[in-house]
């Protein structure tokens, strides 16, 4: 017997008008309004079912209810329904709203997910990660700006993913339902609005290991020009700063502004800046060779604070591989990688796999590890708790992996990001050559996986810039600043410090000349090798606690070598040659740098060799720079003769126009930068927090990039400098500005991981 006319009418024309919530911009209000919409829809449907069932002569509700898709009653029983959300962009939402009927809108193939748009435990980046893992489709934030709330039958097919929320093992099980129009997946659209999940901010954000943002503290102190001060009745300390690198100069400068007028800086070399060293060529002083730090990401917020303060914020993009035309040489075969395009096909698997890992994270056995992009997004949006807990899970699972073994575990496993399993050793070698954005990482494959991952999460591998004036202009300008009638540079003594010892309540500094001086406080920024071998600070526990001594003695310092060549012309522009070359021979990475873009006839600069670790160590056997240049030129000519024929110094002057440096044999450095081996991240923790340990304050404080979580980056040097200054002001009775690192409630990690 056929159903009544009312039943047929309801089955074909059940109203599906959605509730418009686009004006709601508060999460708690959106939560309430969405709940009300679901309740009203269910109540409305219940009334209709009762009415229709009463009129149905068979006593059974029509299975085409709710526009023919939503079976509320089957065999006399009500089918359970769930709430879910389809995330879409504004354009797709408009098409849905304009469609008549809405069922013809482009929703087929989309995934509904049980994460609400007012959920504050998840960020937008995590949503992108979850949707990709559930659907295999990539989304950009603009594609997820809006949502449609739906009721969906529990009989619909679904897939569940375990996504971590808390470090104690608690996970959020995220369920997705694929929407199809043909397969009678029963669902009903209820409401629509804007996605209010946490989004990244445009300002600064903290680094993952610290979860404290130093930039707002510096910004806040800009008006007063100081991070602390001493009341009139409080005596000011006599302070020594060991090392006139960027960290030591920031320490001295900030102490002077805080009112400490007895500050002496000891510098063993004849220049200031440390690893911020820009060599200017005699015949072209505007062309500079960055012998140390040369790439500066905008995410280095403290660095850019000081660059802006001293009028040096005008930066240009660094010519990293793929951002400019890049020549790749692998096993003697040449490949061209055009700027801004995909790399050659040979490299697609590793290129796509690494980028998929950044966006999608890693699915391993029982858990989805948060993607680096999602963690960065959480830092930007202020979701510190989730960022902390996600990072702790990475530490627990990968803390004892080298970068090499971590890559193997991720890309040779059952769920490789990008969907393609890498081959060994072929893809290994390709990845070593190509790297993760700033060139090949092959020489540091045995460093810790976590050490490399933190650089990515902190944003240090993105949008790297170069300083047109040369980065050593920053320490020069700090040193030339006059405070209370005396410049910082006038307080520098160019002499080596041989020993630092406790002497009752004072700290004794013994110089190479044999002279000794007593100080109330000492900040040591001279690097780990000097701390151990020259200053003899780790011989006992009179100054540092045993774990700090262990970290100083055992932290790994990376070897690095650079050789620059100033050429008569910018030959790569004259002859339309790529300005970046990556090779698997001894040259490794070659960069053509233009410091005079306004002058097409100006001199060219080529960083003909930038190597790390074993590749750098080999070059130590050829200390003569002319011989080393000839060796490198010959190696390049075998694969790229059209490029190599231009690698001769301007005016054939090897003495003035070729410069090289090996950081491992630099007696004042003992290495280029700290790079933790696997399982050694707790060394960074001991070194970084030493100055903030007020319970064990001996008057000697560590600072410098090697005492931070980001060895080799200026950011860590400035952060630790701030720590030391705050410790001195606080310990000596001064008053610090609010929001300083000493009063911050640090949320520490467990770096002694269990894997």
UniProtKB/Swiss-Prot annotation:
Molecular function terms from GO: L-amino-acid oxidase activity; tryptophan 2-monooxygenase activity
Ligand binding (substrate): 295
Keywords: Auxin biosynthesis, Crown gall tumor, Flavoprotein, FMN, Monooxygenase, Oxidoreductase, Plasmid
Pathway entry: Plant hormone metabolism; auxin biosynthesis
Note on how the cofactor is bound: Binds 1 FMN per subunit.
Keyword tRNA-binding: no
GO biological process, one term: amino acid catabolic process
EC number: 1.13.12.3
Catalysis: reaction(s): L-tryptophan + O2 = indole-3-acetamide + CO2 + H2O
Protein origin, superkingdom: Bacteria
Keyword Kinase found: no
Annotated positions binding FMN: 247, 267, 275, 295
Further details from the record: The sequence shown is that of Ach5.
Family of this protein: Belongs to the tryptophan 2-monooxygenase family.
PANTHER family: AMINE OXIDASE, FLAVIN MONOAMINE OXIDASE
Protein's name in the database: Tryptophan 2-monooxygenase
Gene (UniProt): tms1
């Amino acid at each position: 017997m056929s159903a009544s006319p009312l039943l047929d009418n309801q089955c074909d024309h059940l109203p599906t008008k959605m509730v418009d919530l686009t004006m709601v911009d508060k999460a708690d209000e959106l939560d309430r309004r969405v709940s009300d919409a679901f309740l009203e829809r269910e109540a409305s449907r219940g009334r209709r079912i009762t009415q229709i069932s009463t009129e149905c002569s068979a006593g059974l509700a029509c299975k085409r209810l709710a526009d023919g898709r939503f079976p509320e009653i089957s065999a006399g029983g009500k089918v359970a329904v769930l709430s879910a959300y389809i995330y879409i962009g504004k354009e797709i939402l408009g098409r849905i709203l304009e469609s008549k009927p809405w069922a013809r809108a482009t929703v087929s193939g989309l995934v509904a997910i049980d994460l609400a748009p007012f959920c504050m435990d998840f960020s937008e980046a995590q949503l992108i990660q979850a949707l990709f893992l559930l659907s295999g489709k990539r989304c950009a934030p603009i594609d997820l700006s809006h949502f449609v709330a739906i009721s969906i039958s529990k009989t619909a097919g679904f897939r569940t993913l375990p996504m971590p929320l808390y470090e104690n093992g608690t996970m959020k099980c995220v369920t997705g339902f694929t929407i199809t129009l043909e397969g009678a997946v029963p669902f009903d659209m209820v409401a629509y609005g804007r996605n209010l999940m946490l989004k990244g901010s445009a300002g600064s954000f903290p680094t993952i290991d610290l979860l404290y943002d130093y930039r707002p503290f510096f910004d806040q102190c800009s008006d007063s020009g100081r991070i602390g001060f001493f009341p009139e009745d409080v005596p000011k300390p006599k302070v020594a700063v060991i090392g006139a690198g960027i960290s030591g100069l920031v320490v001295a400068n900030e102490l002077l502004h805080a009112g400490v007028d007895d500050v002496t800086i000891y510098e063993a070399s004849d220049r200031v800046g440390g690893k911020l060293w820009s060599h200017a060529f005699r015949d072209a002083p505007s062309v500079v060779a960055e012998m140390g730090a040369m790439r500066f990401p905008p995410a280095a917020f403290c660095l850019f604070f000081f660059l802006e303060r001293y009028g040096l914020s005008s930066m240009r993009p660094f010519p990293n591989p793929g951002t400019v035309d890049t020549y790749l040489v692998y096993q003697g075969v040449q490949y061209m990688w055009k700027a801004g395009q995909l790399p050659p096909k040979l490299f697609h698997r590793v290129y796509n796999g690494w980028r998929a890992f950044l966006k999608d994270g890693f699915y391993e056995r029982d858990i989805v590890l948060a993607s680096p992009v999602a963690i960065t997004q959480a830092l930007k949006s202020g979701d510190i708790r989730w960022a902390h807990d996600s990072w702790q899970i990475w530490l627990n699972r990968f803390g004892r992996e080298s970068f090499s073994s971590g890559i193997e575990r991720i890309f040779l496993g059952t769920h490789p990001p990008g969907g393609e399993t890498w081959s060994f050793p072929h893809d290994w070698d390709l990845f070593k050559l190509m790297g993760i954005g700033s060139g090949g990482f092959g020489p540091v494959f045995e460093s810790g996986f976590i050490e490399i991952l933190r650089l990515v999460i902190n944003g240090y591998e993105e949008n790297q810039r170069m300083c047109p004036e040369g980065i050593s202009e920053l320490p020069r300008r700090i040193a030339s600043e006059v405070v209370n009638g005396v410049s910082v540079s006038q307080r520098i003594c160019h002499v080596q410090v041989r020993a630092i010892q406790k002497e009752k309540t004072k700290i004794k500094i013994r110089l190479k000349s044999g002279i000794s001086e007593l100080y109330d406080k000492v900040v040591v920024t001279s690097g780990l090798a000097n701390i151990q071998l020259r200053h003899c600070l780790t011989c006992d526990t009179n100054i540092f606690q045993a774990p700090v001594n262990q970290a100083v003695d055992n932290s790994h310092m990376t070897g690095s070598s650079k050789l620059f060549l100033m050429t008569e012309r910018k030959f790569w522009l004259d002859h339309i040659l790529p300005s970046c070359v990556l090779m698997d021979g001894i040259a490794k990475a070659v960069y053509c740098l233009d410091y005079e873009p306004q002058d097409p006839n100006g001199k060219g600069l080529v960083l003909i060799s930038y190597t790390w670790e074993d590749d750098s160590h080999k070059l130590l056997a050829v200390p003569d720079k002319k011989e080393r240049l000839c060796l490198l030129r010959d190696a390049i000519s075998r694969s790229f003769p059209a490029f190599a024929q231009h690698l001769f110094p301007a005016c054939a002057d090897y003495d003035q126009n070729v410069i090289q440096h090996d950081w491992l044999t630099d007696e004042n450095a003992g290495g280029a930068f700290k790079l933790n081996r696997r399982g050694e991240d707790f060394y960074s923790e001991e070194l970084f927090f030493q100055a903030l340990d007020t319970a064990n304050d001996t008057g000697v404080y560590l600072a410098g990039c090697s005492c931070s979580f980001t060895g080799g980056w200026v950011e860590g040097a400035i952060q630790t400098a701030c720590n030391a200054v705050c410790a001195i002001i606080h310990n000596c009775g001064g008053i610090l500005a609010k929001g300083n690192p000493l009063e911050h409630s640090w949320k520490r990690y467990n770096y002694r991981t269990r894997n």
